[in-house]
Amino acid sequence: MNGNIISFFIDSSTKYEDRIVYFRQISEFLSGLECNYPFFNEWLDKVYHELSQGKRTVIILVDKPSCKIIGLAILKDSIQEKKICTLRVAASHQHQGCGSYLIEQSIRLLKDPKPLITVSEEHVDAFKPLFRRFGFKIEDRVKSV
């Protein structure tokens, strides 16, 4: 990652007003994924509510010059599962270490060296090099709803 990228995370300790602003930007950054994930908008609403309940954390990467989100990881941290629900890096910043950084930070925050990670079938091949780097293996495939 280059020096023009800053990272931070939002969780239940983030001020309500800031969560609203960040979530608008997150929603915009993730737009376009609706076609790969059934009930995507409903899921995103659920993530927002669980964020305020302390069940989710979002790691965000921002390009300083443009002030735009260029990457994020949405985490679910519960007794039942430690999970990277969403991992996305803008095409303009792929192959620059952003995805690796997000996984490293996810592992640190989840306190689990091998958290569950879900990826749509359409994107599995794109993630293979990153998964190999961290020793992730395909454990299961779930057919879309």
Short names for language-model regions:
Residues 121-144:
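Conserved active-site alpha-helix within GNAT-family acetyltransferase domains
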Residues 76, 80-91:
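Conserved acetyl-CoA binding element of GNAT-fold acetyltransferases
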Residues 39, 85-86, 94, 126:
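Acidic/histidine-enriched, beta-strand-rich ligand/metal-binding domains
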Residues 31-65:
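Active-site rim helix/loop that mediates acceptor-substrate recognition in acyltransferases
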Residues 66-72, 82:
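Glycine-rich phosphate/pyrophosphate-binding loop shared by adenosine-nucleotide-utilizing enzymes
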Residues 1-44:
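Short amphipathic alpha-helix that is part of the acyltransferase structural core
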Residues 89, 95-109:
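Conserved acetyl-CoA-binding loop-helix of GNAT-fold acetyltransferases
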Residues 110-122:
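Conserved GNAT acetyl-CoA-binding A-motif
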